[in-house]
Amino acid sequence: MATICALAVVLAGVAAYGWHVGWFAKSTSNGNTTTPQTSQTSALPRADVPSPKKNEPAAQAQRAVSAMTLEERVGQLVMVPLFAGSDPSSLASTITDEHIGSAILIGNWNTGADTVKTATAQLQGYAPAGNRLIIATDQEGGQVQHLTGTGFDTMPSAVEQGTMSADALRQSAGTWGSQLAAAGINVDLAPVLGTVVGDRASNAPIGALDRDFGLDAAGNAEHGIAVIEGLRDAQVGAAVKHYPGLGAVSGNTDFTTEGILDTTTTLGGAEAGAFDQAITKTDPAMVMMSLATYQSIDPNNPAVFSSTIIDGHIRNALKYTGVVISDSMSAEALSSYDVSQLGVKLVEAGGDMSCIGQTDYVKPIVDGLNERAKSDPAFASKVTAAATRVMALKIKMGLA
């Protein structure tokens, strides 16, 4: 969801999960645990990734995933929504029964940090002690700030942030990130790195809402990097979005299937280049994929389902090994697809995590992933690789 899905949250006390400071300090210089039966895991594929040193997060993640059942691996690939005003207990059975690994706080959480902290702590209580939840939210600033009230600063819009120096913005982002961390949020689905190329008012998802930094691609990259680094200073992960940019479409993918064909963006162009620079310089926790279609890149698939963009460019060209997450799978832009195949198509393209903005989408997406993986060994290998990337992120963040 272009305006909703910027989501991931973790339990309040940062020290409680033993954050891996080395990863969070990277600069631009470049017990409810279950013991699965052997018969459930021995035949499952290993992650198809290079063999890392045994103490590196990737190696630890491989070991963790090798001990998981298929259903547990699939659960790591799903982010479920908790809406403002909803009781966290409404997700208890979903998290435990489906082995869900991530949650997102959606809506107008306007009663302050204590309310959020209580909710995130309750959510974490449903997860195994050795595999805590990623908990995210959209906290961009301006019109897209889901958490407000005592304990959360009123954040300026991204356009206003674009008038700040990079150093000042990094410092401010560190403050905002510290507020998120104290409330139990560990991933901020920000910053938006799209570059608006035409009339701002006619660009419904970004320009009309002042969600970009209001600069050229180079300036947007510089300010996006500052936000990523500021959040990392606060031990909060960032999700750059919406790759490769929504600045050249007129329609908002959350609400329409019209006006979401980008006819100008290319992988070698400045707009996608802003993302590429931020990704290669900061190695963000996540890259969120756009739901628009890019005529000059892959005219047959939205970016979220494009192996050309994810496997071909983000994975192979940029060498990004982090988590690739969808924008909201329940957005109108994807309404023509079979819900049970949404997560499948993301993983087939090289992606990892389905961000879900509507509760009734969760079960069919989970079931679709499980059914395909059980019948298709090649797809099961992709599930294993995706779960390994998610677990590597959790290990870096001290969640597993």
Question: Which sequence ranges carry the predicted segments?
Answer:
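N-terminal hydrophobic targeting/anchoring segments and the immediately downstream early-domain regions
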Residues: M1-S27, G31-I134, G142-Q145
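Short, acidic/polar
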Residues: A84-T96, A168-Q179, A272-Q277, D338-K345
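Mid-to-C-terminal alpha-helical segments outside catalytic/metal-binding sites
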Residues: P377-A400
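Second-shell loop/turn segments in exported
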Residues: A47-P52, V80-G85, L105-T111, S157-Q171, ...
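Glycine-rich, aromatic-flanked loop segments that form ligand/cofactor-binding clefts
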Residues: Y126-F152, S172-G198, N220-P244
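Hydrophobic faces of well-ordered beta-strands that scaffold small-molecule active sites
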Residues: G75-L82, G101-L105, L133-Q139, V187-P191, ...
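Solvent-exposed loop/turn segments at secondary-structure junctions
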Residues: F83-D87, N108-G112, Q139-V144, V187, ...
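Second-shell residues forming the walls of enzyme active-site clefts
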Residues: T69, D114-L123, G219-A378
